[in-house]
Amino acid sequence: MNKKYGCLIALLLLALLVSVGLNFGQFLGKLDLDVGMDAGIATAHPKRHLRETVVETAKKPTQDKIVHIDLEGIISSMEMGGLFAEAMPSVDSIKRALEQAVADKKVKAIVLRINSPGGEVTASDIIYNAVKKAAKEKPVVVYMDSMAASGGYYVACGATKIVASETTLTASIGVIIETMNYSELFGKVGLSMTTFTSGAFKDSLSGARPMRDDEKAYVQNLVTQMYDRFLGIVSESRGVPKDQLKTVADGRVVTGREALDAKLVDQIGYVEDAYALARVLGKAADAGVVKYRHEVSLFDALGMASAKAAQQPAKVQFDLSSGLLPKLQPGVPYFLPPSYAR
């Protein structure tokens, strides 16, 4: 009897081991690893698979499709921390989605839905460039949701066409850099800071002392340079002279209707109208609409804790008491409405 139970247990253990082995093999097959050699050390990084979810079925049997991509929230190159670690799309995730859509021959056009107040200058510029690059291959229609302001509008300028809702808040064409000065507070509490620099402008944004006039002029020049690039991109994209744009390119936020009147967008409508326009531009009248989603791997589930601990990347931390707005980094240039920088 004991021998029978022993054989049964052995068989069950063997079956369990075979099952685990097969499942692990399937997992490795599904997990696309990007393997690279660095100084003789092999490193593997998981590539995120972008799976498709049907948003609108095709009107007739066809393989043609329109891809819907979302750009939501503050545009940042930094990793979101804490509760919102996966809440915001990264620059890389947007680029990957655009690249996959361009590479897929069945995709006839792209609809990029933007619901963002803007964000970092460089991150916005990178996504704008990716959108512009994609638009050279396939039509890209931007649909502006509740807000596509500042950096959000900057990104939209890379598209083939722009559709906005009547109530969309957009434009806010401008640049902002903030720093906090606490030198008087230091004096009141008896604190002081000694700084050693290699040049007169190395600590221009230090809050430990008042800024000199030449430092203010220096920082303002940086802002002006970035603003001029922003204005130039809008002018080229929309075919509107810079002088004409300056009536609305002073940092103000405008509605979708006002944006249409100022030639900042092409038409008023809803996301369904953006789909319809994409079908026309892509010459795919019966195309369905799909949305990309990330396949969560085991590495994502585990959070790649060891890698994150080793890299210690910069993060944008959220303060739940302040309306879910990120704390902006002092001295970093942003394409944001002023109200988002407070």
What are the residue ranges of the model-derived segments?
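Alpha-helix C-terminal capping segments
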Residues: 155-161
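N-terminal organellar transit peptides
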Residues: 1-142, 146-149, 161-165, 177-342
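Hydrophobic/aromatic ligand-binding patch that stacks against planar heteroaromatic rings
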Residues: 154-155, 185
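Extracytoplasmic ligand-binding site segments that recognize negatively charged/polar headgroups
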Residues: 172
